[in-house]
């Protein structure tokens, strides 16, 4: 499924500011991991370190949050998982790739759509300068906004 992508700042500046504040602490955790471990490591090492930071800061989370998918009224037998489900409201998908591309974005967007989780963070630890993208899904319209 393709998404209409919009800028949340243009659509709803107040919501955009709220979400940025809400994600600020999580971004700080990711930046700490990147700063201390550096670039070019395995994705799982970054996930392990991020989980340590979440635990140290008492940030509620689930690592490898599994979810089911319904298809034609039946539950598909195999489950997917997102790297982190934080505060029961935010999906974090961790990457360690040269650069974020459409495949990584589409993966996160599909997870958000299938579960109705409205906030998603795509974080790439591999480059020398880390990359972070934030998304908000309007579940009524299926419009994906970046912020």
Language model features: what each stretch is:
Residues 1-37:
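Interdomain/boundary linker segments immediately adjacent to catalytic/signaling cores
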Residues 19-24, 39-43, 47, 51:
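Nuclease catalytic cores
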Residues 38, 82-98, 111:
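Conserved catalytic cores of phosphodiester-cleaving nucleases, focusing on short active-site segments
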Residues 95-147:
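Nucleic-acid nuclease catalytic cores
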């Amino acid at each position: 499924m393709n998404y209409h992508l919009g800028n949340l700042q243009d659509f709803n500046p107040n919501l955009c500011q709220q979400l940025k504040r809400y994600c600020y602490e999580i971004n700080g955790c990711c930046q700490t991991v990147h700063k201390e471990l550096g670039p070019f490591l395995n994705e799982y090492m970054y996930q392990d370190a991020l989980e340590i930071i979440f635990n140290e800061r008492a940030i509620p989370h689930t690592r490898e949050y599994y979810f089911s998918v319904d298809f034609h009224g039946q539950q598909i037998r195999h489950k997917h998982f997102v790297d982190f489900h934080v505060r029961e409201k935010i999906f974090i998908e961790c990457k360690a790739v040269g650069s974020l591309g459409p495949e990584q974005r589409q993966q996160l967007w599909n997870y958000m759509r299938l579960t109705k989780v409205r906030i998603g963070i795509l974080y790439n630890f591999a480059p020398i300068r880390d990359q972070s993208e934030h998304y908000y899904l309007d579940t009524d319209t299926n419009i994906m906004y970046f912020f």
